[in-house]
Swiss-Prot record:
<keyword id="KW-0689">Ribosomal protein</keyword>
<dbReference type="GO" id="GO:0019843">
    <property type="term" value="F:rRNA binding"/>
</dbReference>
<protein>
    <recommendedName>
        <fullName>Small ribosomal subunit protein uS15</fullName>
    </recommendedName>
</protein>
<keyword id="KW-0687">Ribonucleoprotein</keyword>
<comment type="function">
    <text>Forms an intersubunit bridge (bridge B4) with the 23S rRNA of the 50S subunit in the ribosome.</text>
</comment>
<comment type="subunit">
    <text>Part of the 30S ribosomal subunit. Forms a bridge to the 50S subunit in the 70S ribosome, contacting the 23S rRNA.</text>
</comment>
<comment type="similarity">
    <text>Belongs to the universal ribosomal protein uS15 family.</text>
</comment>
<keyword id="KW-0694">RNA-binding</keyword>
<dbReference type="GO" id="GO:0003735">
    <property type="term" value="F:structural constituent of ribosome"/>
</dbReference>
<keyword id="KW-0699">rRNA-binding</keyword>
<dbReference type="Pfam" id="PF00312">
    <property type="entry name" value="Ribosomal_S15"/>
</dbReference>
<dbReference type="InterPro" id="IPR009068">
    <property type="entry name" value="uS15_NS1_RNA-bd_sf"/>
</dbReference>
<dbReference type="InterPro" id="IPR005290">
    <property type="entry name" value="Ribosomal_uS15_bac-type"/>
</dbReference>
<feature type="compositionally biased region" description="Basic and acidic residues">
    <location>
        <begin position="1"/>
        <end position="21"/>
    </location>
</feature>
<dbReference type="GO" id="GO:0022627">
    <property type="term" value="C:cytosolic small ribosomal subunit"/>
</dbReference>
<dbReference type="GO" id="GO:0006412">
    <property type="term" value="P:translation"/>
</dbReference>
<comment type="function">
    <text>One of the primary rRNA binding proteins, it binds directly to 16S rRNA where it helps nucleate assembly of the platform of the 30S subunit by binding and bridging several RNA helices of the 16S rRNA.</text>
</comment>
């Protein structure tokens, strides 16, 4: 359950800090969040698909690590990002 290339490019364009930015924590977290949301919907409808569920857990862990890094390095960017993505209600 990967997101389409077009959708991924839209996310990158929206969250990029400068032209050609694909590796900043904001972009990586935004792409992972979209992927996690799709996998979450898949897991709700296919409850016995444990393989995809494990992939979902790995992506959540990766996003958690990136969020911790961003919080540690630049708290203001972290707060803006979680507000834009709607995380940490």
């Amino acid at each position: 359950m990967a997101i389409s290339q077009e959708r991924k490019n839209e996310i990158i364009k929206e969250y990029a800090r400068h032209e050609g930015d694909t590796g900043s924590p904001e972009v990586q977290i935004a792409v992972l969040t979209e992927d996690i949301n799709q996998l979450n919907e898949h897991a709700r409808t296919h409850k016995k698909d444990h393989h995809s569920y494990r992939g979902l857990m790995k992506k959540i862990g990766h996003r958690r690590n990136l969020l911790a890094y961003l919080r540690k390095t630049d708290i203001q960017r972290y707060r803006e990002l979680i507000q834009r993505l709607g995380l940490r209600r």
